[in-house]
């Protein structure tokens, strides 16, 4: 049996968290790798002060606020000569922190592991599985750890760089009106930023799986055009245009947050997205359900072409 489906798997930090890695920005801020403990001034002081008072510590959003010329940061004073080296120190410390988490024992009972094992085809591997990771960790190390890499043809691109060559991309989106010289915080301005055909692959995929993505303000520009297209009633009538889209997230509340982000991206046409596609949400806290088993089994045993 040969399956000709095109499958795209998009991984966010929730994927690493489900594997058992403590890689959230909150974990980083509370670790011994945090570089700004006790600092009172500049970028370091600004970030450290918010670490103490915010339950949800969104590092990149805080960088966004700090760099924005529209945002007052009283009592902190911007000074690029101090903040630029602090920014690079932040990136280096984050890399050291994640390298430590990358080598821990994985939770083999997790939904993330179950998904990877089920996506390994048990028949002719003619189907194309393309992976896009927004994480800094090496997916090949996960495959090797689980002994499922051999014979599996996986093409993985790392949107924000990897730890392997110290090329991680940390920063903000380009819509921010930056304070002079703070454009260095913008992801696309960083020298290691590269092009990726993620939008093209999403458009041509039959099956799309998002795992651990929050679709927050920093990253949703990657997907906004795609999700708008998925709600276009004119496209719905085109042959073979219906897509199966699965979103894996932790629980119902995080699912609700994602739906709000989707409505923000597609002009509040979430109903059309459900109607014009086969959209499913899976919650990792529910474990391995019959619905999840049926969904993954259907990927490999129902050819769309």
Locations of regions flagged by a protein language model:
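Active-site neighborhood of HAD-like aspartate-dependent phosphohydrolases
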Residues: 19-33
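Hydrophobic packing residues within well-ordered alpha-helices of enzyme cores
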Residues: 28, 139-143, 226, 258
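Aromatic side chains
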Residues: 15, 25-28, 134-136, 222
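SIR2/sirtuin-family catalytic core signature
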Residues: 1-19, 147-148, 197-305
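Glycine-rich loops and low-complexity Gly/Arg-rich segments
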Residues: 33-37, 180-186, 233-236, 273
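Generic structural "secondary-structure junction" signal
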Residues: 17, 21, 165, 170-172, ...
